[in-house]
Amino acid sequence: MTTLLNPYFGEFGGMYVPQILMPALRQLEEAFVSAQKDPEFQAQFNDLLKNYAGRPTALTKCQNITAGTNTTLYLKREDLLHGGAHKTNQVLGQALLAKRMGKTEIIAETGAGQHGVASALASALLGLKCRIYMGAKDVERQSPNVFRMRLMGAEVIPVHSGSATLKDACNEALRDWSGSYETAHYMLGTAAGPHPYPTIVREFQRMIGEETKAQILEREGRLPDAVIACVGGGSNAIGMFADFINETDVGLIGVEPGGHGIETGEHGAPLKHGRVGIYFGMKAPMMQTEDGQIEESYSISAGLDFPSVGPQHAYLNSTGRADYVSITDDEALEAFKTLCLHEGIIPALESSHALAHALKMMRENPEKEQLLVVNLSGRGDKDIFTVHDILKARGEI
């Protein structure tokens, strides 16, 4: 199919979907390209971001955790956004696109529940019906977010097949959309999947990096040495990275979930420890068995528990423009506790992975003068029960 925008990032990306979905993807691409040129659409989107979601979000300088080092550490506070995470940014854009295309329903998948909450709130705001697929395991470990979705009128559908996590929810959402695309828009929650989703999600998240650049220049008079973000599918990270890609003096660091340790096989780090294949409508690195079956990913954080990654991250990794590392559950949990105890901020477990790597950079070279920005992609309210149970089992509380 001829596309208006390039569907690939190097060799990664594409549109590997059943033929029945091609017209829906073409319609979506046309609507997006048209909307990007429409001042009225942009004004409506920007108004929602400012007056509904609460942008711009703060850039907070850490006061205490850098003590004894020469690191200056800032947090981009996406946790302060309405809905509790960066997810709200792009769902408002996609919901406006859905209305523009004349759709009346939203289909979404969710892992941690943050994209589900964001989809539910955008649907409620704009008068769209909403059904959300969620792995049965995630329904259990993210019960507060499940209730939030239902409070806002969304139908939450637990998925029991496979590993009963995010990848299975994605499969069910795509299956639903195959039969309902004439009236429904599939509101994909990350910068992955078939074209044009990776591009759409990046563009509807890029204000994270744009704001960060303006704020850090105002505060410090220079660009950061590195920006750091967690990577599951990769939407918060690509939103942070997008405006810095051409700033070659700024390091881009993506942090994948190392789970129980890469050597155990129980992780979610396909960029560094997967193989390229076709999954979820795209060509990208993914966790696979020797015979090519999709392997189960694992992370303490439901939002990073995904066996593949967005194609632009795969490209940035292949060219060396961005560096990708992994952080274990234990390291993320320590970072979570550190931010709570010393800065009075409760981060999402997803964001705690990015914070953990920043703390590691700081502690490994305390004499080095460095200016770092961590994208604090979400707040940790949803994770307090998970953390409570772990700390209780360890006898720490």
From Swiss-Prot:
Residue positions, PTM N6-(pyridoxal phosphate)lysine: 87
Signal peptide (UniProt feature, chain positions): none
Catalytic function, reaction form: (1S,2R)-1-C-(indol-3-yl)glycerol 3-phosphate + L-serine = D-glyceraldehyde 3-phosphate + L-tryptophan + H2O
EC numbers, comma separated: 4.2.1.20
GO cellular component, one term: cytoplasm
Any GO MF annotation of the entry: tryptophan synthase activity
Function per UniProt: The beta subunit is responsible for the synthesis of L-tryptophan from indole and L-serine.
Family: Belongs to the TrpB family.
HAMAP family given in the database record: Trp_synth_beta
Protein name: Tryptophan synthase beta chain
